[in-house]
């Protein structure tokens, strides 16, 4: 394939919508307060069957979709599943353990499986659609000048887990287990989202799926604001920078952490999850600028692309 024929995910999305229509949120909100999302995970793009078993794949499928609902300020209630099954998926060794894990993951969020479709595929393709409810929806376009930028948890673990599996990096415990867990079975921050929705003003929110270097510009663009990021405030677990460069950490995708704007100072922990203020919005420029002290920094790594 010629290089100029390879489109970025954002370009594909723009082409699909009619001229003048811009969809920047991961969820759709209807007039009755229902919130919808759908996400697909594909063999070779989002997981490898030599690394992930049916249990882990089912968990990841649920979590990435729940994460979208959490980023929209909603609570998931119903699910529809489309399964593209390859010839390697036998009933006993794959479909049954996948089904058990899927039901356990959905039940943990009180989500009802309502229907779907199955088909034969050359490789595994799994799509989950979630419907939820919300009384305080969060749109990416809701950011205001002077808002504080917050990040839940920490970043870098997912990419480190990928490198452990792909390159055989020798990482000591407990960092090794934390990295593998984040890469193979990341967890949505739904509890944090619920608590914020109840008690704290949130201007806008998104989940971290493509890395900070790609996702932060999306947030800034949607609210037509600039973001000033303090690199020294970004939460990175001890010793990760021994194995990854800072640019790689900022490119780590599928972390499923929440990035959100709020006009108020928030506590440093919520639902046993850290909340870190890593920057603020500004009307002085558009886009994202990273600072280390008073010096602006730029990075070559751009984050996780789906194409």
Swiss-Prot record:
It comes from the Bacteria. Mg(2+) 5 binds at residue 210. Reaction mechanism of ThiL seems to utilize a direct, inline transfer of the gamma-phosphate of ATP to TMP rather than a phosphorylated enzyme intermediate. Substrate binds at residues 46, 254, 304. Pathway: Cofactor biosynthesis; thiamine diphosphate biosynthesis; thiamine diphosphate from thiamine phosphate: step 1/1. NCBIfam families: thiL. Mg(2+) 2 binds at residues 39, 68. Keywords: ATP-binding, Kinase, Magnesium, Metal-binding, Nucleotide-binding, Thiamine biosynthesis, Transferase. One of its GO terms (molecular function) is ATP binding. This is Thiamine-monophosphate kinase. One of its GO terms (biological process) is thiamine diphosphate biosynthetic process. Mg(2+) 1 binds at residues 38-39, 117. Its EC number is 2.7.4.16. SUPFAM superfamilies: PurM C-terminal domain-like, PurM N-terminal domain-like. Mg(2+) 3 binds at residues 26, 68, 207. It catalyses: thiamine phosphate + ATP = thiamine diphosphate + ADP. Belongs to the thiamine-monophosphate kinase family. Mg(2+) 4 binds at residues 26, 37, 68. ATP binds at residues 116-117, 140, 209. Catalyzes the ATP-dependent phosphorylation of thiamine-monophosphate (TMP) to form thiamine-pyrophosphate (TPP), the active form of vitamin B1.
